[in-house]
């Protein structure tokens, strides 16, 4: 029987990600279960160069667009009561969450 739940969170907006992480931490502190984390993982950075002039005449000038993806991992004891409350946590649209029982 699994005794821990691993919660993976990722988002492009770090403020919303930290908001959800703080909600999970306060939930664990209120219920008194053991929590490990949040463990920050390396930030993925994607860069897309785009040519400013689409017709290609003149000098080639480039704009660089980038997107950063911030990730966190939290390990929490998988008590049934805690898991039910965890499902009720408000998660913004740009924060993605994945729960795995280990």
Swiss-Prot record:
Signal peptide annotation: none
Q: Name one GO cellular component term.
A: small ribosomal subunit
User: Which keywords does this Swiss-Prot/TrEMBL entry list?
Assistant: Ribonucleoprotein, Ribosomal protein
Q: Which InterPro entries match?
A: Ribosomal_uS10, Ribosomal_uS10_CS, Ribosomal_uS10_dom, Ribosomal_uS10_dom_sf, Ribosomal_uS10_euk/arc
Q: Which GO terms describe its biological process?
A: translation
Q: Which SUPFAM superfamilies match?
A: Ribosomal protein S10 (SSF54999)
Ribosomal protein in keyword set: yes
- The reply to whether Ribonucleoprotein figures as a keyword in the UniProt entry is yes
Q: Name one GO molecular function term.
A: structural constituent of ribosome
Per the entry, what this protein does is: Involved in the binding of tRNA to the ribosomes.
The entry assigns this protein to a family as follows: Belongs to the universal ribosomal protein uS10 family.
> How is the quaternary structure described?
Part of the 30S ribosomal subunit.
Tell me what this protein is called: Small ribosomal subunit protein uS10
């Amino acid at each position: 029987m699994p005794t821990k739940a691993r919660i993976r969170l990722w988002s492009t907006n770090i403020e919303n990600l930290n908001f959800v992480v703080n909600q999970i931490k306060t939930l664990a502190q209120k219920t008194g279960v053991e929590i490990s984390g949040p463990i920050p993982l390396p930030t993925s950075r994607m860069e897309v160069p785009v040519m400013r002039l689409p017709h290609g005449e003149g000098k080639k000038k480039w704009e660089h667009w980038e997107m950063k993806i911030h990730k966190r991992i939290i390990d929490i004891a998988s008590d049934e009561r805690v898991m039910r409350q965890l499902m009720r946590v408000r998660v913004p649209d740009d924060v993605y969450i994945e729960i795995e029982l280990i």
